[in-house]
């Protein structure tokens, strides 16, 4: 079994191949993340403490933390799971992984040195591997070197040496620092703020102009409405005046009619009074003549009364005769009449 040992303090790592099963027996039945002493590997490893980071079996399937078995398992994995890198967004895949328990079927075991022992391990603890890539962001560089805002971050960038060429000076390459505050950045910021300020001012001016136009339009609308109301009032008042004039004319006409009627009544009264006076005067003149006529008329009236009585008697006599006469003729009389008619007809023939 291969033991891949890493030492984070120096950044170095080294692989050791151990064939003795007695030395490897101490790793069996241990889980990932468990810490174990390395004294059983030899005297040079005395005092070292390892942490099991993972491993691969003989077919190359990786160990997965949380799978409590020493065999393979097929799991549906997605983004964020270990032992799987999705090729598409949202992709899931069923993969074969090995459990987190160590046994003899592993081909490689990854170990991390948690505690250094008494002796140095050649190629692991005595050599330091420089970081090829340092922090790129300005705030992370300040955090790494504990810098303040006044310090220049560009001097602390981790540079990478380029391969040397014959007859030329050695060259290094440094990454571009992100979020670095420079005069150009400040100038751009000032420019953005100025544009924003101008935009705000232009918006305020446009709003003021709009409000001015709006007030003007509202004022015009109010004036138009007032003029319309006044014209309607004038039209109503003119209509009312015409109606009042018509009413006055009608009242004048009615008064004239009443005056005419009263005048006619007075004239009638006067004429009637005059007629009555004339009639009284005429009566006063006629009364002596009537007295003379009355004596003559008395004899005439007596004769006239006798004539009337005779007429009444004559009228009463035929009425009584009519009452006494029968309504129907007797049958014998009828027969005689019919016989007489027949004789007349025969004579004519």
Swiss-Prot record:
User: Does Ligase appear among the keywords?
Assistant: no
The terms under GO molecular function for this entry are:
structural constituent of ribosome
User: Record's superkingdom?
Assistant: Eukaryota
Q: Where is this region: Disordered?
A: 224-349
Compartment(s) of residence: Cytoplasm; Nucleus, Nucleolus
Sorted keywords for this record are:
Cytoplasm, Nucleus, Phosphoprotein, Ribonucleoprotein, Ribosomal protein
PROSITE patterns on file: RIBOSOMAL_S6E
Entry protein name = Small ribosomal subunit protein eS6
**Native source organism of the sequence:** Aedes albopictus (Asian tiger mosquito)
